[in-house]
Amino acid sequence: MNTGKPASNALAKAALLPDVARLAGVSTATVDRVLNRRPGVRPATVERVLKAAAELKYLPENDLYAALAPQPMRLTFLLPAGTNRFIRMMGDTVGYLHEHWAPYNVRCHVDYIESFNPEELAHSVLRAGERADGVAFMALEHPAVREAVNTLAERKVPTVTLISDISNTLRTAYVGLDNRAAGRTAAYLIGRFIGPRSSKTTAKVAMIAGSLSYRAHEEREAGFLQLFQEQFPGIEVVGLREGHDDARKNYEQTKVLLEQHPDLAGIYNIGGASDGVARAMEEAGCAHKVVFVGHGLSPDTRALLIRGSMDAVITQSPQTAMTSCVRIFTNVRDGLEPMGGVEVARSQVIFRENLP
C-alpha cells in the first residue's frame, strides 16, 4: 500500500517555497524559475536562491552544488529549407563554431522548416520555445508569427530575428543588414555598370525576389526602386517576380523575363538561389551582356563570379551573424543589454577581382 510519503514530501516543499523566497529576498515566481532552471534570472539571484534553499534544507547540499554548476543555454535556430546555399552555410556555421562558442556555455540546435509558410513558422517558433531558452529565426511578416513571438516574450523566452526582421513585436533583437541600404547598393552598382543613357533611350532592369512576405526582401526592393528614381532616371524597372529562393523557380522566372524583354540590361536577385537566374541567362546567351547583382557569397555565387555570369554579390559574414545571435542570448541570460558588445552586421560587395 502506498504510504503517501512522496505526496508528503511534495507538500513540505510547497510549504517551504515562500520561506525560500523570503530568505532570498525574491518572489516565489523567481524561486520557481531558478529551481526549474528557466532563463531570465540574474546569476547572482540564482546563487542567492539556491543558497537559501540549501539553508532551509529545501534543497540537499549535493543538489545545491549540482544546481550551482551553470547549465548550457539551449538555443534553437529555425532556418528555411530549400536550395539557398547561403542559408545552408549559416546552419553549418552552428556545427563548426561549437568549440569557438564554448565560453558562452550554450548548446545550439538547427531546425530546417518549410519556407515561406507563416503558419508553419509560427508553429515552429512556439514549439521551439517549449524546449529552448532562446529562438532565432528568419521572420515572415504575418499576424501568426507576431503572435508567436509575443507569446514567447510573455514566457520570458527571448527571440532574435535573423536576416529578415518583423514589425510590431516584442522580439529581443534583429541580426542582419540594413536591407533598404542593401537594395540601394544593388541599384547603384547596376546603374553604374549599365552607364549613362541618353534622354531618348532607357535601360530595362528586372528583379527576382524570394518573397515579399520577407521584410528583408520588401525593404531591398524599396531601396532599389528609390535609388533609381533619385539617380538613374534613364533606367526603367520592368518587373518583379517571386522565385521563393528556389533555383528551379528562379530559372523559370528569369526565362520568362528574358523572353518578354530581350533587351533587358540588368537583373537584381533580391533573395537566394542565384544559380537558377544565371542558368537562364547563360542558356539565352546573355550572361555577359546583362548586369547581374545578387546576395550571399556561397560556393554557387563564387563560381558565378569567377566565370563572369554574375557581376557583384552583396554579402555578410554568416559566422558573425550566428555569433551575434549567441552573444545576444547570453547577454539576456546574464541580465545585460541584449546588444552589448554585439558586432553590427556589415555588408560587403564582392566582385571577381576581390574574392576572399
Kindly give the residue locations of the regions a language model identified:
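N-terminal helix-turn-helix DNA-binding module of bacterial transcription factors
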Residues: M1-Y65
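Hydrophobic alpha-helical
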Residues: G134-V135, A139-A153, F224, G239-P299
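Hydrophobic alpha-helical segments within soluble ligand-binding/sensing domains
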Residues: Y174-T202, N250-Y251, L297, T301, ...
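Hinge/beta->alpha junction and helix N-cap segments in small-molecule ligand-binding domains
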Residues: P80-I87, H109-E120, E141, G176-R184, ...
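Amphipathic helical "hinge" segments at domain boundaries
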Residues: P60-H123
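Hinge/cleft segment of the Venus flytrap/periplasmic-binding protein
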Residues: L212, F228, S317-P356
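Non-catalytic structural scaffold of enzyme domains
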Residues: A122, L126, I190-F193, M207, ...
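Flexible loop/hinge segments that line or gate small-molecule binding clefts
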Residues: A144-A181, S298-I306
